[in-house]
């Protein structure tokens, strides 16, 4: 069976490095949405808790329930209000017109649109939003935003920072002791984090985004069969690869049904052990030079992201949750 290995020491190293940058584990919000970016939320939750993390963010109520035993505070980022929210959790308020649809007396964090224009309330409408919240029984405990271009060297990041500072100044006139968070993974290493803010960290906790961090996830496959591919013989659908000489090849138990991008046999896709994939990837398998019973498919998602002209996030979150994940 294919296997994902999670490097426990690397993960703990990364969290300590991030906490040092922020100032403490208490100001750290670990984002565990989408199965912790493919790494395995339930596997990593106790590690984060043991280091001192008490606040996490997830996508949905279902994700929150999976790890609620580990954390005091869980923020649900992408919730559609239905009137039966769980008071155990904190909910993001992404659209002020939805105030009346939430169950009353639950805790919310107000999302501010500082320039990404995806979710949230723009700064110009903030006082109106505050009035609506004050007229409800919702408990506003925090406010946050998301930087759209923190990893780009342009001025929009600084515009968004300034907009959030304006929003904080407004909301502080009406509420005290709110929890603020704007800095995400991309913004973490771009300057000093405001003293009154927490920091939400997503993919950076798994070793991406800073050269001082360590990759946490590695993907492995196991051999199904092996054979001698004779000179002139082809392998896989369409016979894209033809052997230039006799060679020993093997088929391994990982394919595009497992969440990998489908390799079409064109270009050189290098695996984690330096061997190239041979021929088109199948639904449940791929072939390469025989590399033993177990082969590392990748240790660095950036390599596959570059090959398929996408981002490392997409490579990781697509990994099938049914692939076994183990701590090493």
Curated annotation (Swiss-Prot):
Pathway: Amino-acid biosynthesis; D-alanine biosynthesis; D-alanine from L-alanine: step 1/1. InterPro entries: Ala_racemase, Ala_racemase/Decarboxylase_C, Ala_racemase_C, Ala_racemase_N, Ala_racemase_pyridoxalP-BS, PLP-binding_barrel. It catalyses: L-alanine = D-alanine. One of its GO terms (molecular function) is alanine racemase activity. GO terms for biological process: D-alanine biosynthetic process; peptidoglycan biosynthetic process. Substrate binds at residues 118, 283. One of its GO terms (cellular component) is cytosol. It comes from the Bacteria. It is an enzyme of class 5 (isomerase). Belongs to the alanine racemase family. This is Alanine racemase. It comes from Campylobacter jejuni subsp. jejuni serotype O:2 (strain ATCC 700819 / NCTC 11168).
